[in-house]
Structure formats: structure tokens, C-alpha cells
Amino acid sequence: MSGSKYKPAPLATLPSTLDPAEYDVSPETRRAQVERLSIRARLKREYLLQYNDPKRVSHIEDPALIRWTYARSANIYPNFRPTPKNSLLGAVAGFGPLIFWYYVFKTDRDRKERLIQEGKLDRKFNISY
């Protein structure tokens, strides 16, 4: 077993304990990790202070969540790229119902007109016989 090497699964990441870079970290990388952890701890402490405040009267606004919501919903046009698929879907969604209802009404009207001309349709509320 001493010669066997760990082979990661194709869709799973390598565990950090088996990653050789986990223990051979340069001072700059370690400094960046410590800085990120300190920012995260500060933000977490700030959130917990707001969350556990007994005099809180409104909800806590998370700026990252607000930015994400804005980018997801209200700001779609700068991120929109027209493609043939988008164009086809837009045409189907825009003109498809119009064409469908035109076909339904036109065929129904033509069928009734043909039955009237053949005298097979009983027109109950016809005023001008």
C-alpha cells in the first residue's frame, strides 16, 4: 500500500489534506489567506452583532445580496447577448400566440361560413332571414 497513489474522482476535488500545495505555501499566499479570513471574520462578527441586536427594528441589509439581486434581475440588458436561439425563442413567444389564435379564429369562421352557405347551420338569433 505504500506505493499506491491517491487518484481523485473526475467530478470531485482533491481534499485539501492531500493537496501538496497545502503545506508548501509561500508567505504571500499565506498572507492573502490570513487577510481573507480576517475580512470574513470581521464581516461575520458585524452580521452577528446586527442579527442579535435586541433593539433591531428593521431587517439586515446585506450589500452582497443586494448587488447579486440587482445583477440577477434588474440589470439583464448589459449582460444579454443576442444569439440565434434567443432570437428564435423571442419570435416564437411574440408571434406564436398571434399566429395560433389567427388560425383558430379563421378556421372556425370559415367552417361556419361554409355550413351557412350549405344551409346546415341553424342560426338561432339571426334577425335578417
UniProtKB/Swiss-Prot annotation:
UniProt key word Transmembrane: yes
TM region(s), chain numbering: 88-105
Entry membrane topology: Single-pass membrane protein
Subcellular location(s) per record: Mitochondrion inner membrane
Subunit organization: Complex I is composed of 45 different subunits.
PANTHER family named in the record: NADH DEHYDROGENASE [UBIQUINONE] 1 BETA SUBCOMPLEX SUBUNIT 4 (PTHR15469:SF0), NADH-UBIQUINONE OXIDOREDUCTASE B15 SUBUNIT (PTHR15469)
Similarity comment text for this entry: Belongs to the complex I NDUFB4 subunit family.
Protein name: NADH dehydrogenase [ubiquinone] 1 beta subcomplex subunit 4
